[in-house]
Amino acid sequence: RYWRDWSSDVCSSDLGSRAYLAIMFATTLGGIFVVSVLIGLLTSGIQDKLRELRKGKSFVVEEGHTLILGWSPQVNTIVSELVIANESLKRAAIVILAEQDKTAMDDAIHQHVGDTKSTRVVCRTGSPIDLAHLAIVNPEGARSIVVLSPEGPDPDAHVIKVLLALLNGRHKIPERCHIVAEIRDARNVEPVELVGRGQVEVVLVEDLISRITVQTCRQSGLSVVYGELLDFAGDEFYLARAPELAGKTFGEALFCFERCALVGIKRDGEVELGPDFDRVLHADDEVVVIAEDDTTVRVDLRAPSFDEARLCRSTRVPTPPERTLILGYNRRAALILRQLDAYVAEGSEALVVADVDRLDERLGGVALERLSLSWRRGDTTSRAL
């Protein structure tokens, strides 16, 4: 009771005058107002910073990353294959710079690629031909760079502009960085090689697809073989140094790999698959092998034993004339016909059926030696046709 009476007396004596209470009330309201304004400013600043980060304009701090310049339908496939290739790396990164919204790129990769495992995918919005935008993605620290050909008219001109900005700008790309550029027209290969100064590997997409299309249509099951070799699931091609094979012939080196298959050599920047068996290997040569992983490429100099009497010699069988039906038409039709002409026997025929205008003008100028070409306009989805 004593403490209750004492505290009530103290509280009643501290009430103060009405003026004092008014000042305290105004101070409290002012404090609440200032704190509210401060919270609003902090919230607005954080939201602005997050909004700026969503725009994809911040600098990329990754090192040793794979840099993709441009956006095309092939991006999802490229990222998927790189994710598989980087499974043995702890901190792998893929950086994409394209004139697309960052959120849209992130959503597209998440939808089509899914789990990227140990690989981090970073998207940035910008033009690959703009030096300021290129600086954002740290090209000097990249392990490899892929320049994609965009959709639309004259895509090769855009690729050349990107290479000029990349190699002739203020960025110093190290020689160890492997640069791959996608080109569609064979006439533009020489300008790209001139700009690349020996540092750019040109992939002639249209010609490559045409070759694979012709070869797979002529041999059943070959598409499965190409799929096995060209993706990172299973076995694929690898280049490796093997100085211990110096002085051996290619035929002798075939038996020096236990868990991979030797298929060619790389000398002075040129790759030759299936060289002569008596070709002598040099210490600075690189071997081209088919292996499950680069860690399985190991040389074993112990000579294997086998019965040479069981080896069979094949005889060449003459190829008869063929008839090929091509349904549809696109910009690769002429390339496919030329590639087909190089494989078939004399007297072979090819019929192109497509529902396009001026088909005779489009195909009339294709120069063929062994193949007799004819065309017909019609709806390829019609059963009556």
Each model region followed by its residue ranges:
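Single conserved hydrophobic/aromatic residue that forms the stacking wall/gate
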Residues: 2-6, 10
